[in-house]
Amino acid sequence: MKDMLVTPQRKTLRPHQVKALKMVRDSAAAGNRKIVCQLATGAGKTVLASRFIEGALEKGKRVMFTAPAVSLIDQSVSAFENEGITDIGVLQASHPRTNPDARVQVASVQTLARRDMPPVDLVIVDEAHIRAKVVEDLMQQRDDIFFIGLSATPWAKGMGLLWDDLICACTVSELIQQGFLSKFQVFAPDIPDLDGVKTVAGDYDSKQAEGVMSGKSIMGSIVENWLRNGENRPTLVFGVNRAHAASIAEDFQRAGVATAYIDAFTDVVERQQIERKFRSGEIKVACSVRTLTTGVDWPVSCIVDAAPTQSEILHLQKIGRGLRVNPGTEDLKVFDHAGNSLRLGLVTDIHHEELDKTPPKQRQKAEKKEKLPKACGNCGTLITGLVCPFCGHERKPIPGVETEDGELIEITEGERKVPTKQEKQDFYSMALWLAMKRGYKHGWAANLYRKKFGVWPRSLEEVMK
């Protein structure tokens, strides 16, 4: 398979793309036949895929490219044609590009599940983290086929049980530093209370989460904050479900903002019209649930996230829609009304070195977060360090106490000292401040105090620091 991955010299590739090609070839040379290539949203997955295809075609091989949705088929074909690949057939009923003799076949996983697999030597799986039974069955049954998976977020449960190797040529942070992805700034205008929301199939229950996010305070804040801080930027808004996203769209429209709503049932013609108007600036805001989380390269410079999630994959996919560098936009602003960045971390801090190997009936083990962001006390930007890179404000930690994973922990040396009343007051005051910042009641701070000291803070003053 190594000789199928020859790098064509037709175009100059970016350094991380050249590195990715080499890493995949090296992995193939080591005997791996099912390789996942991690590449951030906006980092050129299509160009990389075209190089894999060209290398295979040069050796007389046949290729199948699978997309996670029918709506992405034409987009994929156009992208490959722009890279000079023309011998393409589409595996889809009544499609004008249907050509079973073409050496490159493009199909959605939905169509592939209803068809016989054509003869191929290489299968490229786009958005490989979206697991499809037809692809997985093929991987288990056909040892003669070489598989390459493409994903910005290859962290789905059990991927390591199917794929042999994960390669990552460049992180999101490195791509931002090199100018290939946009710089971004995250704000948390609201911190919803999700304590009572149950978990269903690994994520927040949609109906209960909608109830929290549809409250007057948060719904009013979404539009008000955008009008005040959104700078009229082209914006994608993510809601909890269709009803919630449509309601947000109506609120924007009532405020006089040109807004569209799009979901999985939006027909192709209307979707194309919305995209055209969005690109021209006729539409400023597009609201959806998950329809716009993959395969979208619209010129976005603002993300409004109003959909709480426990999924790192979904979190990064949403923010990733705005990381692509576009002419006329210098950076990305993220307004996280769902608190996802506070719970899961900034997208530059989310990274996994290996594929997950959790068996089907076991729960995927959550990794401990190294450092979760907190709001800068001056400009409100979510940051992980003590000094804000945007305004220069320095957060002063309380001596002997630091924050970790949303809790206050005491740093001790040697024997534990008996805390003084002032130290207890300092801790309680900080807990009250943290509760205020997160929109919690004072009882949360009292419980945190009791957890640490074993008693309630009855003799202390309710003052914040």
Give short role names for the model-derived ranges:
Residues 2-38:
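Conserved pre-motif I regulatory segment
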Residues 31-52, 238:
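Walker A/P-loop
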Residues 57-81:
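Conserved Walker A/P-loop ATP-binding site and its immediately adjacent core
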Residues 90-100, 246-247, 257-289:
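Conserved helicase ATPase core of P-loop NTP-dependent helicases/translocases
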Residues 110-113, 131, 264-268, 275-351:
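Conserved RecA-like P-loop NTPase helicase motor core
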Residues 130-186:
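Post-DEXD/H (motif II) to motif III coupling segment of the RecA-like Helicase ATP-binding lobe
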Residues 166-239:
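Conserved interdomain linker/interface between the two RecA-like ATPase lobes of SF2 helicase motors
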Residues 313-317, 323-430:
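C-terminal helicase lobe
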